[in-house]
Regions:
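Short edge beta-strand/loop segments characteristic of extracellular beta-sandwich folds
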Residues: 232-236, 368-375, 485-489, 549-557
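Sec-dependent N-terminal signal peptides
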Residues: 4-13
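Short coil/turn motif common to extracellular beta-sandwich-like domains
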Residues: 225-230, 362-369, 477-483, 544-551
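Surface-exposed, glycine-biased beta-strand/turn segments
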Residues: 19-96, 103-108, 124-132, 137-138, ...
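Long, low-complexity serine/threonine/glycine- and acidic-rich segments characteristic of extracellular
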Residues: 137, 178, 193-196, 201-345, ...
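C-terminal beta-strand-rich structural cap/linker in extracellular carbohydrate-active enzymes
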Residues: 410-418, 518-537
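Short beta-strand elements
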Residues: 332-349, 421-442, 612-616
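Proteolytic processing hotspots in large secreted/extracellular or virion-associated proteins
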Residues: 434-435, 454-502
């Protein structure tokens, strides 16, 4: 009986170990030998999103292999985004591997894809094969390294996700390169997190350089603070043998030796990738052009990579020793040391309103920052009248550059009027609550924010004209799109059947258009949206013509290229497109001779068509 129990324990323990073992994946590039060079890794800060995988650098045409057996579950061919991309589902491990920017696919996949392209009469296709259509073995060729889509150099963008589309760190599965270099830290900031908070006497982020120490870095002198504050920093990782920079994957924050916060950038949902703008101090990053990562949690951040909230409560007269570990995926780390000294701000005592020449305000999350260019004497209060006509007196917080600064917590009530002794300023912003669906509506437009679109309460301006409208200003970015429905009945200037919205960050196209309204979904907030009409067709220019190949340059300066179709003797002819150089060419794998009547139709996103015809 005793031997049986020992055997049972051994079997259970063995199964437990096997369950904890990482899958034996092969590397997708040069799996048997060869030096691997990375130019990017998981968690790098990119515009508005985290980078979700590895960028592996090699010459164009390098074979790409499946890391494990499974089946092709998704294929997309596009000139944008991931370009030519293959998704392989691995049922045994509940993972999905992703291979993007391929120059071409393996012969097996190419035959399948080309058949679908001719079936749909389209270069761009997105296909979801059933599990039995395209089975894949470990180390099977699936394609070749390339530069398709939004790529600016030959490389493979490689990801590992869970079946539920959570992004994993591929470097946890492979020993890719030797690296003994720790992350770098370039600057730190301490930021006030409540209207009562101060850093170096002010309600604004205080930035400081760091100097090197045997442990890592140190801030030269103590930073005075009071109230709830957060630590931020500019950091990235480096590696031996490459000039590329990488993500600092882990951070741990301690106050007086006690850990209060950490993050590990892995295992986050792909659909929350844009929460990157909550991981960084979005406002400070826009002001400085540098990405200050937050070492504390913020409202609405659903990435799930954090432990603890990291916010530090600083009391008057107390001193706090702060340590921050920054670590890369290879376990190399260094530690920042700094001291916070608690210093309560002085209070101004007066019953009088301040006299001011100029009165203005800004909003930082839920804090209203009011600045009054004072007329001596510089002491005094301001009055805030709320929407319910309640009157509040707000004392001066501090002065800077001939201005008195006042701070008000907007969670106490929405202002209607801000008043000094000689100026009255209306508060015109609309409050958009987070955590629930909300609809803003005026004569010209409706703006719908779904639950989760905003990380925190927002205060926005809305302005509408017949040919444009403005939504601004927002301190934190949208996490998800907002839906705008615009009443265009008063617009007698433009025919909207061939119109779109132009924004400084991009273009938005009508999701719905009827006799009275149009609607769009957008993440381009804040900003000015202008209704723009496009009746000009794309241009088409023949670049090269041989018996084996046709090459065209195509383009559209307004709404942009939508799609194209080519026909040879009345039959669909597959062509390939690369938007980066605006070139369109006949499929190099076509075996039929290019002779007879040729017609190329190129459409823009407003439906304008340009036709090129010739006899080959």
């Amino acid at each position: 009986m005793q031997n049986f129990l020992y055997l049972l324990i051994f079997v259970i323990f063995s199964f437990s170990l096997q369950a904890q073992e990482k899958p034996r994946y092969i590397f997708p590039v040069k799996p048997d030998s060869g030096k691997i060079v990375l130019s990017g890794n998981l968690g790098e800060i990119r515009p508005n999103h985290f980078h979700c995988g590895l960028d592996i650098v090699e010459k164009e045409g390098e074979p790409i292999f499946a890391i494990y057996k499974g089946f092709v579950s998704r294929i997309k061919v596009s000139s944008y985004g991931y370009g030519n991309v293959v998704y392989i589902t691995h049922p045994e491990t509940d993972h999905v591997s992703v291979y993007a920017h391929l120059s071409d696919f393996s012969p097996k996949l190419r035959r399948y894809i080309t058949a679908k392209q001719y079936e749909q009469e389209s270069f761009e296709v997105e296909i979801f094969p059933s599990p039995d259509e395209l089975p894949i073995e470990t180390k099977e060729l699936i394609g070749f390294m390339g530069n398709t889509g939004n790529s600016f150099g030959s490389h493979l963008h490689f990801e590992i996700r869970t079946i539920a589309d959570f992004v994993l760190n591929p470097q946890d599965f492979f020993k890719i390169q030797t690296d003994n270099l720790p992350p770098k830290l370039f600057q730190v900031a301490v930021t006030p997190l409540s209207p009562e908070s101060r850093v170096e006497g002010k309600y604004q982020s205080f930035r400081s350089n760091v100097f090197g120490t045997p442990k890592g870095w140190r801030v030269a002198k103590p930073i005075s603070a009071y109230g709830l504050v957060g630590l931020e920093g500019i950091t990235w990782d480096v590696a031996e043998g490459t000039r590329s920079s990488f993500a600092t994957s882990k951070a741990r924050l301690r106050v007086d030796g006690k850990e209060i916060f950490s993050f590990h950038i892995t295992n986050f949902p792909i659909y929350e990738v844009y929460a990157l703008n909550l991981h960084i101090n979005y406002k400070l990053s826009r002001q400085t052009g540098s990405n200050f990562q937050r070492f504390y949690q913020t409202e609405g951040n659903r990435l799930g990579i954090y432990k603890g909230n990291g916010k530090i409560m600083v009391e008057d007269g107390k001193e706090y020793q702060i340590e921050l570990d920054l670590e890369d995926t290879h376990g190399n780390f260094r530690t920042l040391e700094l001291t916070l000294q608690g210093k309560k701000p002085k209070e101004t005592q007066t019953n009088d309103l301040i006299s001011s020449g100029i009165l203005s305000y800004d909003i930082d999350e839920n804090t209203l920052i009011i600045k009054a260019r004072y007329i001596p004497p510089k002491t005094g209060n301001i009055e805030i009248v709320l929407e319910n006509n309640q009157s509040l007196t707000v004392p001066m917080a501090y002065t800077e550059k001939q201005q008195a600064v006042f701070l008000y917590d907007l969670r106490k009530g929405k202002p209607k009027i801000i008043r000094t002794k000689n100026i009255e300023l209306p508060f015109r912003k609309k409050m958009i609550p987070s955590g629930r669906n909300f609809l803003y509506e005026d004569y010209f437009m409706k703006v719908f924010f779904q639950n989760g679109a905003l990380a925190d309460t927002a205060y926005l301006d809305f302005s509408s004209k017949t040919t444009h409208f403005t939504i601004g200003k927002i301190a934190e970015p949208l996490v998800w799109d907002a839906e705008i429905t615009y009443n265009h009945k008063a617009n007698t200037i433009l025919d909207l059947k061939k119109a779109f919205l132009r924004h400084e960050r991009g273009k938005e196209f009508f999701k719905e258009l009827n006799d009275s309204t149009f609607s769009v979904k957008t993440a381009y907030l804040p900003g000015d949206f202008r209704i723009t009409r496009d009746e000009i067709p794309p241009f088409v220019r023949l670049v090269r013509k041989t018996p084996e190949k046709l090459v065209f340059q195509i383009g559209d300066d307004n709404s942009g290229i939508s799609h194209f179709k080519a026909y040879l003797n009345g039959k669909f002819l597959l062509m390939e497109y690369e938007h980066k150089n605006a070139l369109l060419w006949t499929d190099p794998r076509t075996t039929e001779p290019l002779t007879g009547d040729f017609e190329l139709q190129v459409f823009d996103k407003m439906g304008n068509m340009q036709v090129y015809k010739t006899i080959l």
